[in-house]
């Protein structure tokens, strides 16, 4: 299958080129030329299938023309060696727990899949001699998921850019203590500054002639598309539990919009989801777009749901492309909401007190949207995107308890921090990359 640029000013490319390049030559994002429908027989049997089996069928439907089935199966099964359970929280509301992977965040799925796929393509393209340099900007969980997903992958170096002082200590420890083929770059600026540095690097001819660059942010098709796997698995678990699946609403904590875009593509492939909610913190750019029809990026605002502190979501271009730039069509399938830190904290405290279920700040945004916007005849699923312990100081203060840190999270805290400090100007970043 070919992949085209959302900007439409560059030739279509293969999956391998889309994955290795990350961003199209015209600065657009790659999209599959067609979105195939899954057969009805798949949905008839999905309730009896495992996460890995479901994910392989979905992956093979989308990527089967480009990767031999045995290799793809190995990649999928190796990626998803952990569970993604659907837990009942209250009434008709369910949490899809995406924090049971190695770094306890939803991005483990996309990052692990991409690491394995990129390693495979790099070997196909360059044998054992080529070096791919992965650039990734992070506002929190992306850095840890990508760094751990790619740790030790032959022929790949990873450079993680993150805003100084704007990620939690636990998140920071997950990508600054690894060493080996992982370099953490501490940028004196915002997440949007980090993202701008990455995009500028891709567009710099001299830099690209010097080294092979790609991105592991959700702008890369191999990062965001695999995230659709768990939407299908959520549906399967509802079926297995004998719940009503006729009117499913999925609320997605939304920052860079890769997660919700993957769900929207899953819906196009036949997944019976009635509608989506894009749940925002105070960074309400998409919410304002829904209300006005005008997309106006603005500087990001720091919140307690920091992984969603994005003022210009990259994947908005994909949402527009999916709906052929129709504001009306987008509003028909996606609603929005926006909450302050106070409202997020209030939801976390209230939910924990009433149900015993502990939300992280991002999941709380999505859960509150279901509390306020779910009809009686609808079944709501919200994505719980990270373990609450990743935001321990915030969560402890809100619920008034000292929550336990899982062992695999605590292990990251033992290492020594290793970072390269840098300003937000591109010249210094380019100079650094040219020297490595």
Language-model-detected regions and their locations in the chain:
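PLP-dependent amino-acid enzyme catalytic core
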Residues: 1-436
């Amino acid at each position: 299958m070919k992949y085209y640029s959302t900007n439409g000013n560059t030739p279509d490319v293969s999956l391998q080129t889309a994955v290795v390049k990350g961003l199209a030559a015209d600065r657009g994002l790659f999209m599959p030329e067609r979105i195939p429908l899954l057969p009805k027989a798949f949905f008839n049997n999905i309730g009896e299938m495992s996460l890995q089996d479901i994910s392989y069928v979905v992956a093979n439907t989308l990527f089967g023309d480009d990767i031999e089935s045995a290799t793809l199966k190995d990649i999928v099964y190796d990626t998803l060696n952990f569970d993604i359970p659907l837990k009942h929280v209250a009434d008709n509301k369910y949490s899809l727990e995406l924090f049971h992977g190695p770094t306890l965040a939803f991005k483990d799925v996309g990052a692990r899949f991409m690491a394995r796929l990129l390693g495979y393509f790099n070997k196909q393209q360059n044998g054992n001699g080529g070096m791919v340099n992965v650039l990734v900007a992070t506002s929190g969980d992306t850095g840890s998921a990508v760094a751990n997903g790619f740790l030790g992958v032959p022929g790949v170096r990873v450079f993680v850019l993150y805003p100084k002082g704007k990620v939690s200590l636990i998140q920071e420890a997950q990508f600054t203590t690894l060493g080996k083929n992982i370099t953490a770059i501490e940028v004196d600026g915002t997440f949007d500054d980090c993202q701008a540095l990455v995009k500028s690097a891709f567009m710099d001819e001299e830099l690209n002639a010097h080294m092979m660059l790609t991105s592991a942010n959700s702008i890369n098709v191999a990062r965001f598309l695999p995230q659709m796997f768990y939407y299908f698995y959520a549906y399967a678990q509802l079926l297995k539990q004998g719940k009503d699946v006729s009117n499913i609403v999925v609320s997605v904590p939304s920052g860079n919009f890769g997660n919700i875009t993957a769900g929207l593509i899953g819906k196009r492939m036949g997944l019976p989801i009635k509608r989506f909610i894009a749940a925002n913190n105070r960074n309400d750019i998409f919410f304002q777009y829904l209300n006005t029809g005008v997309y106006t990026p603005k500087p990001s605002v720091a919140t307690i749901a920091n992984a969603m502190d994005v003022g210009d979501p990259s994947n908005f271009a994909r949402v527009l492309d999916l709906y052929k730039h129709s504001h009306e069509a987008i509003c028909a399938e996606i609603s929005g909401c926006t909450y302050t830190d106070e409202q997020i904290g209030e939801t976390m405290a209230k939910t924990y007190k009433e149900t015993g279920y502990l939300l992280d700040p991002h999941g709380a945004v999505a859960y509150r949207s279901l509390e306020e916007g779910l009809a009686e005849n609808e079944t709501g699923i919200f994505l719980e995107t990270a373990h609450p312990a990743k935001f321990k100081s915030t969560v402890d203060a809100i619920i008034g308890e000292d929550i336990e840190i899982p062992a695999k999270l605590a292990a990251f805290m033992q290492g020594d921090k290793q970072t390269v400090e840098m300003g937000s100007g591109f010249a210094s970043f380019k100079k650094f990359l040219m020297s490595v």
